Amino acid sequence: MILSPIEQSIKRKIEAVGKPLKDWDIQIYRGVLTGCNEAFIIDAAKRAEILSNCQSEDERKRTEAIIRPILRGRDIRRYDYVDSGKYLINTHNGVKEKGIPPIDITDYPAIKGHLDSFGDAVMLRSDQGDTPYNLRNCAYLEEFEKPKIMYPNMTKYMPFYFDIQGFYQNDKSFLITGRHLSYLAAFLNSSLFKFCFTNSFPELQGGTRELRKIFFDKIPVLPVDDNTDELFEELLRSIQDFYSNEKALEIDRHIFDLYQLTPEEVALIGAVNL
């Protein structure tokens, strides 16, 4: 692709001050792979049914604790998400290195009954843990509970959502944990990122982009200090509480200022359709 002189100027500015994301203090992970989504990802009605089948209050509390709200890649929006009312039955396989034991299905009879109803689809699936009732090993299990940036693995719109609610995610999405996530989420949702880096991700059929980690690692992003991240934390909280174009433009202006873009450069970037 041949860039105009002003486009080349913007690209040089980004690359001159940017640090590749692979060198940031962040981690990028894939969402949960169950091997049988129809059994392990349930709606609110099925969740209520499973809980009603518990034989004691203790079982109900244990069961409720491992049925976690989950977002799919398609549910993620720019600064927002669609609540599809889905839940993950998180019968995880533990993390031996951290002393987290696997879920013992005998402690969860109501969940066992639900999973048993799927027969070989659960029992014989390839992605399983120590038992067919357990999900496959996931060394980053605790990362889902942390503040994180969520985004789909394939998308036309490249949306990012900063989650502090502890959503789990399916395997059609990725999560980023680490430092300065408020700023990073704002940058990834900005006009500048879309303008400069959309073409850094392979285009698939229908204009969809593939947002794999191997491509993210190469993206240069200006590092910031804690004070700057706190500024974007406030901006992010505001726009995620109630979205408006004015708030999105305000975030863009702060990003443009950080990169010291000229009015001419800003005008060109402002034409990007978000």
Predicted regions and their residues:
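Non-catalytic DNA-recognition/assembly elements of restriction-modification systems
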Residues: 17, 21, 25, 110-114, ...
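Polybasic, glycine- and aromatic-enriched phosphate-binding surface used to engage nucleic acids
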Residues: 1-227
